[in-house]
Amino acid sequence: MAPSQLPPIFNPTPQDIEMLLAAQCHLGSKNLQVHMEPYLWKTRPDGVNVINVGKTWEKILLAARIIAAIDNPADICVISARPYGQRAVLKFASHTGATAIAGRFTPGNFTNYITRSFKEPRLIVVTDPRTDAQAIKEASYVNIPVIALCDTDSPTDFVDVAIPTNNKGRHAIGLIWWLLAREVLRLRGTLANREVDWDVVVDLYFYRDPEAEENKEVAEEKVASAEDVGAGAIESGFAAESWDAQGAAAPAAFAAAGATSWEADGGDWAASSAPAPGGENWAEAQPAEGAKW
């Protein structure tokens, strides 16, 4: 990390640097755009360009000072066509009062006043200059300043302030938007001082897959708790109640079925055990004529 040119009050804390590294904000792509070269720290042997997180922090503070200088927060438009940044811009807008455009950017939002979604912002902040190219192009037509989260391969045409960071990972995007919102609130005075931690956790800015969350809820509903089936069932895989019910019902059913069959067949047994009438002996009986063994 290069020496900072900021006043000591604006220096990042060790926790801020650890969060930037943990979210992999410093890992760029293998391609390098010429205008992003000043923000490069080094290139790894595998070809991945590593971004200087000190420059990232300085640009976050610069962008926060620009945003805080605008009187009406609604005049700031935060945009993300990339899915990983849509939740982040919505949370940023709710915490700072900005206007969010999450998803597809309708062409003509800034230039065609006939459209219902026409806007005249004083500043726009985009997640990726490549996916949000339409918004940047229209902003250049009407002289709107642009702040963008730029990777090492991002185009910087018509971008006024580039925040060098990894803009492809969901954790990196969410963390940058969270840090930007926190610094804006500190400059506005919403947060008392820099020693006070923000009570909003960074996890709220991370992208979440709706299908994965729905499948997780369904799986949790199917799994029975220990209170429902008993602690022994969790270990053995069988509920004790089912064993007890089967053990109590089986002897009774067997006894009832056996008693009825024996009583019904009792008469037949007595008849078959009686001696044959006439004292006949099967050994004395003569075989019929024509019978052959």
Swiss-Prot record:
<dbReference type="GO" id="GO:0002181">
    <property type="term" value="P:cytoplasmic translation"/>
</dbReference>
<comment type="similarity">
    <text>Belongs to the universal ribosomal protein uS2 family.</text>
</comment>
<feature type="region of interest" description="Disordered">
    <location>
        <begin position="265"/>
        <end position="293"/>
    </location>
</feature>
<keyword id="KW-0687">Ribonucleoprotein</keyword>
<dbReference type="GO" id="GO:0003735">
    <property type="term" value="F:structural constituent of ribosome"/>
</dbReference>
<dbReference type="InterPro" id="IPR027498">
    <property type="entry name" value="Ribosomal_uS2_euk"/>
</dbReference>
<protein>
    <recommendedName>
        <fullName>Small ribosomal subunit protein uS2</fullName>
    </recommendedName>
</protein>
<dbReference type="Pfam" id="PF00318">
    <property type="entry name" value="Ribosomal_S2"/>
</dbReference>
<dbReference type="InterPro" id="IPR005707">
    <property type="entry name" value="Ribosomal_uS2_euk/arc"/>
</dbReference>
<dbReference type="Pfam" id="PF16122">
    <property type="entry name" value="40S_SA_C"/>
</dbReference>
<comment type="subunit">
    <text>Component of the small ribosomal subunit. Mature ribosomes consist of a small (40S) and a large (60S) subunit. The 40S subunit contains about 33 different proteins and 1 molecule of RNA (18S). The 60S subunit contains about 49 different proteins and 3 molecules of RNA (25S, 5.8S and 5S). Interacts with rps21.</text>
</comment>
<dbReference type="InterPro" id="IPR001865">
    <property type="entry name" value="Ribosomal_uS2"/>
</dbReference>
<dbReference type="InterPro" id="IPR018130">
    <property type="entry name" value="Ribosomal_uS2_CS"/>
</dbReference>
<dbReference type="InterPro" id="IPR023591">
    <property type="entry name" value="Ribosomal_uS2_flav_dom_sf"/>
</dbReference>
<comment type="function">
    <text>Required for the assembly and/or stability of the 40S ribosomal subunit. Required for the processing of the 20S rRNA-precursor to mature 18S rRNA in a late step of the maturation of 40S ribosomal subunits.</text>
</comment>
<dbReference type="GO" id="GO:0022627">
    <property type="term" value="C:cytosolic small ribosomal subunit"/>
</dbReference>
<keyword id="KW-0963">Cytoplasm</keyword>
<dbReference type="GO" id="GO:0000028">
    <property type="term" value="P:ribosomal small subunit assembly"/>
</dbReference>
<keyword id="KW-0689">Ribosomal protein</keyword>
<dbReference type="InterPro" id="IPR032281">
    <property type="entry name" value="Ribosomal_uS2_C"/>
</dbReference>
